[in-house]
A protein has these predicted regions:
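Bacterial Sec-dependent N-terminal signal peptides
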Residues: 1-22
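Periplasmic peptidoglycan-binding/anchoring modules of Gram-negative envelope and division proteins
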Residues: 21-30, 37, 41-77, 105
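Extracytoplasmic
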Residues: 30-32, 69-71, 113, 182-184
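Short loop/turn segments at secondary-structure transitions that flank enzyme active sites
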Residues: 43, 82, 124, 193-195
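Residue-level recognition of well-ordered beta-strand positions that form the cores
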Residues: 77, 188-190
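Periplasmic OmpA-like peptidoglycan-binding domain that tethers envelope proteins to the cell wall
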Residues: 81-187
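Short, charged low-complexity linker/loop segments at the C-terminal edge of domains
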Residues: 192-204
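Amphipathic alpha-helical repeat scaffolds of TPR domains
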Residues: 206-213
Length: 213
């Protein structure tokens, strides 16, 4: 009898087979949330840029009412804009990282996660260049890009020339429109996400009644 059933299955076209449900666990990013800082500030300000929405997102992901059993790690990377001096910016980004660390302690989950990484990256010239390259309204954009690329080994000179370019027109624009995007901490929530993939089962013969979809 069993052999007859197997033979019947093998005789079905490929589209007639019931798909076998499978379960996989994938290490993946659940959410990436960005907290922005005002110029020279280190405290988390809910009124700064999109912080209100970011905090709501963190509440939904990390609060005690959330399903947090799959969350395995938190990665926090903090940055500053390049308008300050080198030593000042190093101190500033460390303080911002510490501020985020204190802010996250409101969530009980954070105290239970085994892997929490905090990293102070400092001046984010790579993102700065991307923002400059994509901003068609930036005065002297090509000259700004040339200065960024040419003076990679002399950051102090690069900053000095950016301030002086065209009597500071480009720099004043960047202070208003580019630098605020760089003053941030990026919080990446990592977890094991369970995925169950069930294809639709459409019976094509009487033997399909043997399966449970």
């Amino acid at each position: 009898f069993i052999l007859a059933i197997l033979m019947a299955l093998l005789s079905l076209p490929e589209s007639g087979y019931a798909a076998v449900p499978f379960f996989t666990v994938i290490n993946d990013t659940i959410r990436r949330v960005v907290i922005y800082f005002d110029a020279n500030e280190t405290n988390v300000n809910p009124c700064c840029k999109g912080n209100k929405e970011a905090i709501i997102a963190l509440d939904s992901l990390l609060s005690g009412n959330s399903d947090t059993k799959y969350i395995t790690a938190l990665n926090v990377v903090s940055f500053v804009s390049p308008d300050g001096g080198e030593s000042y910016n190093k101190s500033l980004v460390t303080k911002r990282n510490n501020s985020i660390k204190e802010f996250l302690r409101r969530y009980e989950l954070v105290n239970n996660v085994d892997k929490i990484h905090f990293c102070s990256k400092g001046e984010d010239w790579l993102e700065f260049r991307k923002l400059v390259a994509s901003d068609t309204n930036l005065p002297d954009r090509e000259e700004v890009l040339m200065l960024i690329d040419y003076h990679k080994d002399d950051i102090a000179k690069r900053k000095q020339l950016l301030r002086k370019l065209n009597r500071g027109a480009a720099y004043r624009y960047m202070v208003r429109n580019v630098f605020p995007e760089l003053r941030r901490s990026v919080i990446t929530i990592v977890g094991e996400t369970g995925i169950i993939d069930r294809e639709a089962f459409e019976p094509v013969s009487s033997v399909s009644g043997l399966f449970v979809s």
